[in-house]
Curated annotation (Swiss-Prot):
Keyword Transport: yes
Name used for this protein in its record: Chloride intracellular channel protein 6
Record's keyword annotation contains Glycosyltransferase: no
Post-translational modification: Phosphorylated.
Compositional bias annotation for Polar residues: 295-306
Tissues where the protein occurs: Expressed in brain, placenta, pancreas, liver, lung, heart, kidney, liver, spleen, soleus muscle, and brown fat.
Catalyzed reaction equations: chloride(in) = chloride(out)
Length: 704
């Protein structure tokens, strides 16, 4: 708690007797209502006035559901059984002795700058030092609801209000349960200690603060102008923070903290801000939190601003409301316009972050009574979010919408497709982003997408990565007109788009029943081809270059190779395979097989040869065999997107029709394929083995 330095050396002033447990909040409309008059430097009566800087907890949020979330266990503990008074203690300050024991244990400590054990409450705000005129306070008191009376000292957790003359410092220690009450002027400090756990720090206006602690961390914070504060703690979890003006009364500390009048089930958190940044905090069940803001700050001449007049009208209209509603309205009158509330809820912490409330928002939506008790305010809805769920008013704030948007999992843009959509030979498009929906393919552009891309290819989509770009890719349909067709060039573009992490639409095309719209789109062109923002791209090599240039870092990964020789590695393998599989003459088969093996051995040598970045110039060990996963390193590149689909076809078709397999001694090729089969970008874009075999059924004829 921010503590102001206390002036010393000022003569003590008259002190009031401690007989009165706590000042009682007067009824609205009566002269001298709570918060209506400021106490002067002289003539302070302990039996009639509350200490300076205390705010009426009953009035500013002690009787309603508004309770602060800041239940803070103070660090001050003591077990003193004797009463002491320092020199300079005012004669009027009476210290009860052992005969005046209360039923609870209580410890009072002065909140001097040296007391660092006291935790500093959050949300503490300073006010302007000037007191507003008495008529203003009386007028505000008339607007507030009836306040139930309570006592400040009694049983366990009782609070002690004490103030001394300017600069005086009073320390009093008494037996268990003794209470100390003293009143004085600005800057006075009273320290009184009782049994372990209870403590009270009291100061007057201009930096004075009062803190009282009860069992298990219950607390009440009431702050006045320029940092005045009162902290009183009650049962575990319940806390109230309230701020008022100089001279306002504070009531806190009935048996076991009941006098705090939390009014909300344990765990609720309410934050309400008053004039000049004052705040009220209270906690309730299940981490529910609420902050109220909106009362205008009064001008220096005592006149109410237009916002205050509007609040007066609202208060007038509140006649006939329940006491809880009126208490809520009274709490709202202690707020500053423009102060934005925030909810804080976390499991076990009763903290929740929420958006901002504005005066005049739509009606509040209330959850069930099992969750929390909340009163509706005429000012508008209050934020209602909990750790287990949320309820928002129709006029939810931008922060609320942003939080909801943030709550949407980014996993929606996943790198895997959960299901396979129907591949229509008639050219129907399917969105490839892991969350396909009916009619999505016909959308011109998905939310947040930069481009509209359609890829017409020949393979069926089983999974794809996703990002911000919608691509339409047209695939060649399989032999049944719907399933994946075999085409290494289509899979090449598939892999590139997946590795780039983009959203794109895929359309399979049945070449026997090619739709008229596709013929008009790319006349005389067979898949694969692509449309990018309406522009048709038909050449596979140019599409690859275009995508690498258009979808460039830093947003999209670079897929180009670092070593130029990786681009040409294995470029003759597929040609040798085609000659080998198409040959039907037995006498020529051996020659074609040797040519294929030669090309494969060349590729295997490159895969086993270490790349320059694999060789450590400072290492004493020579690297003779590469351990990289792919052609250009451990990551897939454009070269892999070109070569891997071809190697996969060779492996399937050669075994099926020529009983040919890659030799086991070609460790580089097998390591390369095994690493590729471990990547979804490759395996999930491969056509089925049956589709590949069917595609070569006419080509791979029996040898004669």
């Amino acid at each position: 708690m921010a503590e102001a330095a206390e002036p010393e050396g000022v003569a003590p002033g008259p002190q009031g007797p401690p007989e009165v447990p706590a000042p009682l909040a007067e009824r609205p409309g009566e002269p001298g209502a709570a918060g209506g008059e400021a106490e002067g430097p002289e003539g302070s009566e302990g039996a009639e006035e509350a200490p300076r800087g205390a705010a009426a907890v009953k009035e500013a949020g002690g009787g309603g559901p508004d309770r602060g979330p800041e239940a803070e266990a103070r660090g001050t503990r003591g077990a003193h059984g004797e009463t002491e008074a320092e020199e300079g203690a005012p004669e009027g300050a009476e210290v009860p002795q052992g005969g005046e024991e209360t039923s609870g244990a209580q410890q009072v400590e002065g909140a001097s700058p040296g007391r660092g054990a006291q935790g500093e409450p959050r949300g503490e705000a300073q006010r302007e030092p000037e007191d507003s005129a008495a008529p203003e306070r009386q007028e505000e008191a008339e607007q507030r609801p009836e306040v139930p009376e309570g006592s400040a000292s009694g049983e366990a957790g009782d609070s002690v209000d004490a103030e001394g003359p300017l600069g005086d410092n009073i320390e009093a220690e008494g037996p268990a349960g003794d209470s100390v009450e003293a009143e004085g002027r600005v800057g006075d400090s009273v320290d009184a200690e009782g049994p372990a756990g209870d403590s009270v720090d009291a100061e007057g206006p201009l930096g004075d603060n009062i803190q009282a602690e009860g069992p298990a961390g219950d607390s009440v914070d009431a702050e006045g102008r320029v940092g005045d504060s009162v902290d009183a703690e009650g049962p575990a979890g319940d806390s109230v923070d309230a701020e008022g003006r100089v001279g306002d009364s504070v009531e806190a500390g009935d048996p076991a903290g009941d006098g705090v009048e939390a009014g909300v089930p344990a765990g609720d958190s309410v934050e309400a801000e008053g004039p000049a940044g004052d705040s009220m905090d209270a906690e309730g069940p299940a981490g529910r939190a609420r902050r109220v803001s909106g009362e205008p700050q009064q001008s220096g001449d005592g006149s109410l601003s237009p916002q205050a007049e509007a609040i007066e009208v609202a208060a007038g209209e509140s006649a006939g409301r329940s006491p809880g509603e009126l208490a809520w309205d009274a709490a709202e009158e202690a707020e500053v316009p423009g102060v934005k509330g925030s909810e804080e809820a976390a499991p076990g912490d009763a903290r929740a972050d929420a958006g901002e409330d504005r005066v005049g928002d739509g009606p509040q939506q209330e959850p069930g009574e099992d969750e929390e008790r909340r009163e509706r305010s005429p000012e508008g809805p209050r934020e209602e979010e909990a750790a287990g769920g949320e309820e928002e008013s129709p006029d939810s704030s931008p922060h609320g919408e942003a939080s909801r948007g943030a709550a949407e999992p980014e996993a929606q843009l996943s790198n895997h497709l959960a299901e396979e959509g129907p591949a229509e030979g008639s050219g129907e498009a399917a969105r490839v982003n892991g969350r396909r929906e009916d009619g999505e393919a016909s959308e011109p552009r998905a939310l947040g997408q930069e481009h509209d891309i359609t890829l017409f290819v020949k393979v069926k989509l089983t999974a794809l990565g996703c990002s911000r770009i919608a691509i339409k890719k047209y695939l060649r349909a399989g032999y049944d007109g719907e399933s994946i067709g075999n085409c290494p060039f289509s899979q090449r573009l598939f892999m590139i788009l997946w590795l780039k992490g983009v959203i794109f639409n895929v359309t399979t095309v049945d070449l026997k029943r090619k739709p008229a719209d596709l013929q008009n789109l790319a006349p005389g062109t067979n898949p694969p081809f692509m449309t990018f923002d309406g522009e048709v791209k038909t050449d596979v090599n140019k599409i690859e270059e275009f995508l690498e240039e258009k979808l460039a870092p830093p947003r999209y990964p670079k897929l180009g190779t670092q070593h130029p020789e990786s681009n040409s590695a294995g470029n003759d393998v597929f040609a040798k395979f085609s000659a080998f599989i198409k040959n039907t003459k037995k006498d020529a088969n051996e020659i074609h097989e040797k040519n294929l093996l030669k090309a494969l051995r060349k590729l295997d040598n490159y895969l086993n040869s270490p790349l320059p970045d694999e060789i450590d110039a400072y290492s004493t060990e020579d690297v003779t065999v590469s351990g990289r996963k792919f052609l250009d390193g451990d990551e897939l590149t454009l070269a892999d997107c070109n070569l891997l689909p071809k190697l996969h076809i060779i492996k399937i078709v050669a075994k099926k029709y020529r009983d040919f397999e890659f030799p086991s001694e070609m460790t580089g090729i097998w390591r390369y394929l095994n690493n590729a089969y471990a990547r979804d970008e490759f395996t999930n874009t491969c056509p089925a083995d049956q589709e590949i075999e069917h595609a070569y059924s006419d080509v791979a004829k029996r040898m004669k």
